[in-house]
Amino acid sequence: MENKIKEYREKSGLSQGKLAEKCNVSRQTINAIENNKYDPSLQLAFDIARTLKVTMEELFISEKGGK
């Protein structure tokens, strides 16, 4: 699933490592999600959205072309 995690993470001034720490995952997990190589669990997706202070709809792009 495509996402805008990197965009919102950078706007928030967080490194991959800091976001990972706040979400209790590895930096490699955040990197893989940002590069569309791994789809996060629903709980992790909510944790990332909450940490970045955005909605799930803002963060993730539907594969059907919607936002």
Give the location of each predicted region.
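Residues in the helix-turn-helix
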Residues: 18, 29, 58
